[in-house]
Swiss-Prot record:
Source taxon at top rank: Viruses
Residue positions of the active site: 82, 155, 157
Signal sequence bounds: none
Lineage of the species this protein comes from: Viruses, Varidnaviria, Bamfordvirae, Nucleocytoviricota, Megaviricetes
GO MF, any single term: transferase activity
Protein's UniProt keywords contain Transferase: yes
Pfam families linked: GATase (PF00117)
Every Glutamine amidotransferase type-1 domain range: 1-176
InterPro entries the UniProt entry points to: ChyE-like (IPR044992), Class_I_gatase-like (IPR029062), GATASE (IPR017926)
Name of the protein described by the UniProt record: Putative glutamine amidotransferase-like protein L716
Annotated Gene3D superfamilies: 3.40.50.880
UniProt source species: Acanthamoeba polyphaga mimivirus (APMV)
Keywords: Glutamine amidotransferase, Transferase
SUPFAM superfamilies assigned: Class I glutamine amidotransferase-like
Amino acid sequence: MLLIIQNGYITPYIYRYLDEDYEIIKSFNVDVTTMDLDKYSVVIILGGYQSVVDINKYSYLLKVIELIKKCLTVKKPLFGICLGFQLIAYALGCEIKSSGKLNVGYDTTILGYDNVFRCHIDYIIPNDSVEVLEYFDNMPYLYKHDNHVYGIQCHPDIAPECIKKYSNHIESYDYAAANKDSINKTNAIIIKYILNLLRDSIKKD
């Protein structure tokens, strides 16, 4: 079973792309440090509106970081998306900075695809704990730590039919409406690809 940590208030849509049972826990309602990690194959840390630059404003995100560190200690496979990508990097000692602008759109190029939604302001400054696998717009967009942690800055978890709940970017609305089938296909492929890498890491251990 997958453990999904929901950090934002919008209902997650990642379930559309999963091939395994899952449990969604809202970090702002539950002390996530109490979760029994032995029940789960992979822990997924989702995005949210918050900024890691101002992490001390969000006491529940400090609990998420504690959970991440616990996962790192026991080598529980971790998958971070957007804010989750930044939270894991922060837990690994990376610096998080603001780009000073909203980076938004569907023209993100990653893993050979060019139709993945992105919507973020902050970005990570990598250290030796993470291996950056891909950059986009001169910012890290995909990294790994050992073989049991992967993070992605963009949003293969957001279904195109739901994009208006996440952004008021008109060009993204129009692109999502015209290309929803191909976007959903890409999202599913990327999510499955990363989850399979993490599952393989369990077998190797």
